[in-house]
Amino acid sequence: MKRTFFTSESVMEGHPDKLCDQIADGILDAILKEDPFARVACDVSASTGLITVFGQITTVSTVDIPAIVRSIIQAVGYTDSDFGIDGKACSVLIGLDRQSPDIAAGVGSSLEKRLGSDDEADQLGAGDQGLMFGYACKETPELMPLPIMLAHRLAKKVAELRKSGELPYLRPDGKTQVTVEYADGHVKRIEAVVIACQHDESVDQERIREDMLRMVIPAVIPAELLDDQTKYFVNAIGVARPVSVRVETFETASLSEELIEELINKHFDLRPAAIIRNFDLRKPIYRNLACYGHFGRPELDLPWERTDKADLLADEMKALNNDMENQEGNAGQGQ
């Protein structure tokens, strides 16, 4: 039986990344209500007490962007500067321009149109190159993988308890993570559940853990997938060791993937401090990595590009293979 683990995470409405997403999409929605053919490339960044809105927008609509920003921040739950930002009092900086004429020309008159196509769907060109991929699976009614759906449901449940007032100490920011164990590609059990939530400083961690275990996890995760080996981490930032290591060789390995995972755990220290030490990450190496990729850069002699453990791993794999062959031979003689 082949055992694998897969982890997915979800962030809550008040997570800075998600807050920025909601503001950008809220601006888009407001513009589309007035101008369905507007072109909106809106980016948002957030810091303590500050929201910046920038990008390129071409529209005939007139929307009050600062008002939209403040409304969304307050709706998410940031109504006090002690939370990190207050929608009523924060600064909102706007740096918007019209869409680039070159991009506008390509979008407004596609290559197919210029070549003579009169198909209505051919008239609008893409504004940039794009790569898209996706898939559907049978693990959930939503045709999505189980780990991400459970992570989303956990995040929604925490937000629900915050908004209803049942857990009044909760604040808008947070993150959830679920690790699912698979056996031969099928869901077997839950290996780990992580819930991290922003909260009032007067509440101790034990109270939060008890509430998450009592009110959130049982309401979301099927009991049959939980067992006494399932690990629960509540506000667990600071855990050093990875929950799991997964290897996929696409049936090219001479050794089982489980044994390869054991060798990786044995010979590669994946704790943050060890990664920093082994890859010498406290040196000023980063500017050279900003362009042309972090991998496949032999001219930079990057520590993570070295294959100095390849021979060691090959020797151990060979020894393990020999041991397995000897065991099979002995078993055959015994028969």
Where are these regions (language model features)?
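N-terminal, positively charged regions that mediate nucleic acid binding
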Residues: 1-41, 317
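Structured, hydrophobic secondary-structure cores that serve as assembly/anchoring elements
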Residues: 5, 12-18, 44-47, 233-239, ...
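Glycine-rich, mobile lid/loop segments that gate access to catalytic sites or pores
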Residues: 7, 74-232, 291, 295-321
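Short, hydrophobic beta-strand segments
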Residues: 50-56, 191-199, 243-249
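A structural-propensity feature for long, helix-poor, extended segments
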Residues: 51, 164-186, 234-261
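Internal helix-turn-beta structural module
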Residues: 236-335
